[in-house]
Amino acid sequence: MIKAQRRILAGWLFISASIGCGDVTSEQQTTGSNIERLFVLRRTVWPSQDINVCWDSAGFDSEKNWVRSAVERSWSLVANVNFANWGNCSAGSNGIRITIDDVGPHTGGLGRDIDGVVQGMVLNFTFSSWGRSCQSSSDSRGFCIRTIATHEFGHALGFAHEQNRTDRPSTCTEPAQGEDGDFTVGSWDLNSVMNYCNPKWNGNGELSSTDIQGAVLMYGLAPSLTLASLPS
């Protein structure tokens, strides 16, 4: 079913493109009307719509719920991908394993390359050492946690940094970071949540039309949506 949706959506995207006339800004990672590009590493796209998520760190129940809510209101809202469970990790847990640490948030790779990897994703909830501007208020801390979660789960779905693209404009001066993708949709997207050159930090955690279209192309359309409901 997912493969069939991808074939349909690939045709839709092609037609649409044809007719279309202190350091909180840094992240450590080891790894309009026109349709724009999203940068994806295809071999890392998860084969199942159900992706297990678990926590290797205890506590922070409220913050963990903020992360889950941010993901469910972004990637899971538009694409046929279900981040499931969200409980504590066990020794043999697969899927996305999240550690909480006061360092730059990052993933250990893209997509399913982090399947079952301890510290496959690292998120920061305290900002005592890294990203201290996120401590300025409780609202700021919540905003940072949610916005970063949306970005990092983009990596967990297989999406690379947009500024890594070789055809980025000269106005984008952020250095390439992490692993590159091997597939693009449309043209370079300033507004992607995966783009460090986005004038809004991590896109304020709000998926651009490109982010949405790329996620749907890779994973299929969320069951509650129709193609007509997606941004053009």
Positions of predicted regions on the chain:
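Bacterial N-terminal signal peptides
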Residues: 10-18
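Bacterial N-terminal signal peptides that target proteins for export
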Residues: 1-11
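Zinc-dependent metalloendopeptidases
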Residues: 22-232
